[in-house]
């Protein structure tokens, strides 16, 4: 299959609201030659990254918008525009190959439309975009609701946040301290000719000069190292783990933090890791097996404690709550296409429900670390503020890290070009069992 068609079909599923790019793309990658998989991936992720900008350009070039049933043609047009403005593919090849894919859509009218619009884009696109630059949606390539939210919440940083969201993310490793120190693993990378340096905040983190195939990393198959962003790595030390503790990782998939907690403290009495979907726990088990670690995995709704909790209290809880994922857009650019403004209040409600449900499972004197990969205070400091107000037995603790910006509650890490993702942490201690 032509990589342009494969990318467009994956993107069409996203545009139709049927899938994320991570779930729709693998099936399409299986249909292209192995040598074209890199191009297919770039076309899909690159188009998603710049979709808000390309969509407004397409609106200028089209006489009328696409119907919902024509998401495949819309996606193919966006892939064509991405090639013209963001790749080194010669214009004649980008247009010819993209238009040629239209035959596979079984929509006879699509070929002529794509040919006309892409050729006009080649002639007039740069001038049209220049005239649209005043629109922050065009300038930042972020949907309007998100651009406005970031500007409102982060008036001094919002443009830098958008720039970081549009940048290619660095590849960051987490060294398994059960096997090597970070310095020792840096030496192994140097011996292998792989450029790398220590992360600023995570004691286990290493940022690679260039992304590489994990199979080329020393000891990857043996569990010496994993791929995980620096911001997500902070949870292991912030939780203040100690031997004999019973730990809960709520909403644990894909298991990176579960594994890191087990690596960080070999003497834990018990690790319970839960997630809503059983199929997502398969990935958690694969990660545990590669690292030769073990945890009790349970598929359940964390809010329904009667269905999974055995009544034995936890000394530590990590709640990496479901969120808008606005801090990891650079890794999942289709978030720009799928997330909507009205998702945020619903997510904040869910986050509060999770805190309320899990709090009774925490031992008096125990700690709960609340985390999200969101950059929106509605899901972060405001959720913690509301929880503290309704929970007399909860107190907030300072976070032992300089990462991020201090907030009224917790700390907010903003995505940085070449650095960590956007993330939020707040740490709570249970000082009394009763709740008002």
From Swiss-Prot:
One of its GO terms (molecular function) is rRNA (cytosine-C5-)-methyltransferase activity. S-adenosyl-L-methionine binds at residues 251-257, 275, 301, 320. Its EC number is 2.1.1.176. InterPro entries: MeTrfase_RsmB-F_NOP2_cat (IPR049560), MeTrfase_RsmB-F_NOP2_dom (IPR001678), NusB-like_sf (IPR035926), NusB_RsmB_TIM44 (IPR006027), RCMT (IPR023267), rRNA_ssu_MeTfrase_B (IPR004573), RsmB-like_ferredoxin (IPR054728), RsmB/NOL1/NOP2-like_CS (IPR018314). GO terms for cellular component: cytosol. It is an enzyme of class 2 (transferase). CDD domains: AdoMet_MTases. The keyword tRNA processing does not apply. The active site is at 373 (nucleophile). GO terms for biological process: regulation of DNA-templated transcription; rRNA base methylation. Its main location: cytoplasm. It catalyses: cytidine(967) in 16S rRNA + S-adenosyl-L-methionine = 5-methylcytidine(967) in 16S rRNA + S-adenosyl-L-homocysteine + H(+). Keywords: Cytoplasm, Methyltransferase, Ribosome biogenesis, RNA-binding, rRNA processing, S-adenosyl-L-methionine, Transferase. It is found in: Cytoplasm. Gene3D superfamilies: Helix hairpin bin (1.10.287.730), NusB-like (1.10.940.10), Sun protein, domain 3 (3.30.70.1170), Vaccinia Virus protein VP39 (3.40.50.150). Specifically methylates the cytosine at position 967 (m5C967) of 16S rRNA. Belongs to the class I-like SAM-binding methyltransferase superfamily. RsmB/NOP family. This is Ribosomal RNA small subunit methyltransferase B.
């Amino acid at each position: 299959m032509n990589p342009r068609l494969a990318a467009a079909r994956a993107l069409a599923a996203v545009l139709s609201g049927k899938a994320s790019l991570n779930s729709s793309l693998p099936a399409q990658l299986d249909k292209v030659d192995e040598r074209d998989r890199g191009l297919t991936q770039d076309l899909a992720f690159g188009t998603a990254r710049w979709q808000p900008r390309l969509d407004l350009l397409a609106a200028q070039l089209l006489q009328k918008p696409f119907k919902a049933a024509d998401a495949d043609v819309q996606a193919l047009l966006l892939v064509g525009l991405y090639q013209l403005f963001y790749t080194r593919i010669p214009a004649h090849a980008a247009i010819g190959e993209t238009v040629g894919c239209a035959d596979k859509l079984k929509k006879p009218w699509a070929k002529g439309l794509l040919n006309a619009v892409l050729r006009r884009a080649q002639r007039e696109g740069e001038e049209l975009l220049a005239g649209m630059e005043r629109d922050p949606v065009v300038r930042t390539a972020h949907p309007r609701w998100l651009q406005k939210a970031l500007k409102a919440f982060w008036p001094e940083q919002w443009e830098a946040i958008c720039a970081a969201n549009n940048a290619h993310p660095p590849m960051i490793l987490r060294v398994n301290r059960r096997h090597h120190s970070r310095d020792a693993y840096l030496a192994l990378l140097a011996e292998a000719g792989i450029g790398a340096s220590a992360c600023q905040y995570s004691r286990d983190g290493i940022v690679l000069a260039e992304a590489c195939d994990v199979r080329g990393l020393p000891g990857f198959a043996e569990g010496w190292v994993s791929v995980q962003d620096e911001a997500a790595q902070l949870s292991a030390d912030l939780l203040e783990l100690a031997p004999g503790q019973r730990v809960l990782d709520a909403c644990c998939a894909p298991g990176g933090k579960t594994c890191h907690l087990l690596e960080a403290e070999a003497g834990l009495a018990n690790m319970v890791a839960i997630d809503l979907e059983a199929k997502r726990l398969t990935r958690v088990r694969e990660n545990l097996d590669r690292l030769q670690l073990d945890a009790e995995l349970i598929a359940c709704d964390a809010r329904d404690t009667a269905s999974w909790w055995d009544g034995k209290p936890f000394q530590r809880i990590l709640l990496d709550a479901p969120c808008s994922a606005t801090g990891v857009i650079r890794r999942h650019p289709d978030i720009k296409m799928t997330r909507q403004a009205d998702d945020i209040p619903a997510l904040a409600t869910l986050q509060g429900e999770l805190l309320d449900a899990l709090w009774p499972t925490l031992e008096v004197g125990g700690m709960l670390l609340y985390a999200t990969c969101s950059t929106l205070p509605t899901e972060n400091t405001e959720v913690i503020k509301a929880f503290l107000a309704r929970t007399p037995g909860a107190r907030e603790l300072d976070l032992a890290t300089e990462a991020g910006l201090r907030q009224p509650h917790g700390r907010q890490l903003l995505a940085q070009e070449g650095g960590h993702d956007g993330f939020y942490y707040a740490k709570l201690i249970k000082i009394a069992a009763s709740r008002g």
